[in-house]
């Protein structure tokens, strides 16, 4: 019945490209398409501490650095430290990378923390008043590394007055003795620890639990936990 004729398809070389061929507002419109009204943002889900990343970035964009720091410190006692050494799992999941590059989430967090460290009156989280039985109990925490200091921080926010025992002469554990200064400056660690002291946390350095003092002796001194 005659030769088969296929419809001719335009090739790239046949197409006159110009501004009429693309959407100048692609970035913003693409972001709206990938935005959901509910659920957890991928960046927050990827963060080991589940910090409210969208919240503090929005506050920082409005210049509300104290509010942004307050939001961060609900979950993270050491934003300046994390700003220096964080693995940035949040940025790896940032949906902005589908358009161009992920947001500089970690740098924003570090910037917020730096604004506070430069301030004459630094932000000290509000402590819940001791209004329940047992809040005056003495609590001993062994070691002043990230885990020990975090434990002391959240206990202090609940109204307790924990005591941190550190065998070394300096506080901070691996943050101070294990991470080189070019990655994490010691002044940054010390600045974070100063806020813990403002919360009423007591520190005893040069005391090795199990050698200089035993658990039984701590019990005798009135420590309940």
Give residue spans per PLM region:
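Extended interfacial segments that mediate partner engagement and assembly in macromolecular machines
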Residues: 116-158
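Beta1-alpha1 glycine-rich phosphate/pyrophosphate-binding loop at the start
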Residues: 16-20, 50-61, 69-70, 75, ...
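Core beta-strand elements of the Rossmann-like FAD/NAD(P) dinucleotide-binding domain
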Residues: 219-225
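Ferredoxin-type iron-sulfur electron-transfer modules and their immediate structural context
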Residues: 1-133, 186, 223
């Amino acid at each position: 019945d005659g030769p088969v004729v296929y419809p001719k398809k335009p090739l790239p070389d046949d197409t006159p490209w110009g501004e009429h061929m693309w959407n100048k507002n692609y970035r913003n419109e693409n972001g709206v398409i990938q935005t959901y009204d509910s659920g957890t943002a991928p960046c927050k889900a990827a963060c080991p501490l589940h910090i409210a990343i969208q919240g503090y970035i929005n506050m920082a964009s409005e210049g509300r650095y104290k509010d942004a720091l307050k939001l961060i410190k609900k979950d993270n006692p050491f934003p300046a430290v994390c700003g220096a050494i964080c693995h940035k799992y949040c940025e790896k999941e940032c949906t902005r990378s589908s358009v161009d590059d992920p947001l500089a989430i970690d740098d924003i967090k570090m910037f917020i923390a730096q604004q506070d460290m430069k301030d004459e009156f630094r932000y000290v989280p509000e402590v819940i008043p001791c209004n329940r039985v047992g809040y005056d109990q003495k609590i001993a925490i062994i070691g002043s590394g990230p885990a020990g200091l975090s434990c002391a921080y959240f206990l202090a926010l609940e109204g307790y007055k924990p005591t941190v025992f550190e065998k070394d002469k300096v506080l901070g554990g691996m943050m101070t003795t294990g991470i080189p200064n070019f990655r994490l400056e010691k002044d940054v660690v010390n600045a974070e620890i100063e806020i813990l002291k403002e919360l009423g946390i007591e520190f005893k350095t040069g005391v090795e639990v199990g050698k200089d003092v035993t658990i039984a002796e701590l019990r005798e001194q009135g420590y309940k936990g």
